[in-house]
């Protein structure tokens, strides 16, 4: 199984590159981050024409995540159910593989800024909620992949 992840920094701008890359690299699933578009603007038709199913959790101007897959997608959850958040940072889905269900969590991690700031505190709360979500999913799906843009540095 081949999985890839890509912080696309605007799917509207980079859709031609995504389609070209997928044609040259026919991965089973691709996690996209920083879509910078709402779900109603997501290019489902173009990606489906290239042979991919897709689910998205978009947000205008910032954030946004998607899963693009050659495999059937089900059981989609947008955001973290245990964390009230307006930012579109997580999408979770199950892929039907020949080896059985694979739970895929695609996340655009918070960039926390410097320790002691409100953004850093938000990042720590978000990471705790993500950890809880991953643990709950592992209890039901022993085959799980956490992918995305982790935005992790030693001090922020």
Task: List each model region and its residues.
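Active-site beta-strand/loop signature of hydrolases that rely on acidic residues for catalysis
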Residues: 6-7, 22-40, 104, 133-156
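Structured beta-strand-rich core segments of catalytic domains in phosphoester-bond hydrolases
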Residues: 35-38, 42-114
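Short amphipathic alpha-helices and their capping/turn segments at secondary-structure boundaries
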Residues: 20-22, 90-99, 129-142
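Short, flexible loop segments at the rims of nucleotide/cofactor-binding pockets, characterized by
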Residues: 6-11, 79-82, 121-124
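Active-site-proximal beta-strand elements of phosphoester/diester hydrolases
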Residues: 1-10, 101-113, 147
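N-terminal, active-site-proximal structural segment of metallo-dependent hydrolase catalytic domains
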Residues: 1-53, 60-65
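Short, well-ordered, mixed-charge alpha-helical segments that flank or form enzyme active sites
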Residues: 111-117, 154-156
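Binuclear metal-dependent hydrolase catalytic cores centered on His/Asp/Glu-rich metal-binding motifs
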Residues: 117-133
